[in-house]
Each structure stands twice: as C-alpha cells, then as structure tokens.
Amino acid sequence: MKFVLLFGVFLVTLFSYSSAEMLDDFDQADEDELLSLIEKEEARAKECTPRFYDCSHDRHSCCRSELFKGVCTCFYPEGGDNEVCTCQQPKHLKYMEKAAGKAKKFGGKIKKWFG
C-alpha cells in the first residue's frame, strides 16, 4: 500500500512538473504574439476613421468611443445605386454608454455623500 501511495505521489509530481514546463513555453509564445498584436493595434489606432465618415476603404478602421468600437455600416441611399459605408455606433451600444456614464456620475455622488 505504501508503494502505491509513493508511486502515485511521484506520478503527480512528475505530471505537475511537465505541465509547468509546457505552460512556460506557451506563456513565452503568447507573450511574443501579444507584443506583436499590441504593436499592430497601436499602428492601426493612429489611422482610425471618425464616426459618420466614409469607411469603405477599410471596414475595420472605425474609431473607438469611450467603451465600444464603431461599426462600419453600409447602405444604399434613397434613389441611388451606389453603396455608401460610414462608421456608426449601433443604438443599443449608444444607450449602454449613456447608462454607464450616468452610473459613473451617480457613483461619484454616492462617494461624496458617504466618503
């Protein structure tokens, strides 16, 4: 019985050591990928398209608002055959931003009252 217990402890220790090494390898690869993604994001952030401007050249270039990124929305104007694309914010996200702003203001008032 003691042998089985010692063998089990040995296997658990060996497994945890090998999985820790694999996780370290994955973490290093993830860090490298993350750094390259951050560099790309910083480069892309400088060229964002403001809200209500044409985004047909790059549909993923809309600027971020306080909480959410704008969405490139395409439509056909009335009586026109050409497609027009502009950066816009969906209404539900607009309302969520307004609610978050009001909650933040209310939280500040509560902090003043009790803080």
Swiss-Prot record:
Keyword Metal-binding: no
Tissue expression pattern: Expressed by the venom gland.
One Gene Ontology molecular-function label: toxin activity
Pfam family, one: Toxin_35
Annotated coiled-coil segments of the chain: none
Domain of life of the source: Eukaryota
Sequence similarity: Belongs to the neurotoxin 19 (CSTX) family. 01 subfamily.
Major location (coarse): secreted
Designated name of the protein: U3-lycotoxin-Ls1j
GO CC list: extracellular region
Record note on domains: The presence of a 'disulfide through disulfide knot' structurally defines this protein as a knottin.
Propeptide: 21-44
Entry keywords, A to Z: Disulfide bond, Knottin, Secreted, Signal, Toxin
InterPro entries per record: Spider_toxin_CSTX_knottin, Spider_toxin_CSTX_Knottin_CS
Disulfide-bond pairs as recorded: C48-C63, C55-C72, C62-C87, C74-C85
Residues of the signal peptide: 1-20
Naturally occurring in which organism (per UniProt): Lycosa singoriensis (Wolf spider)
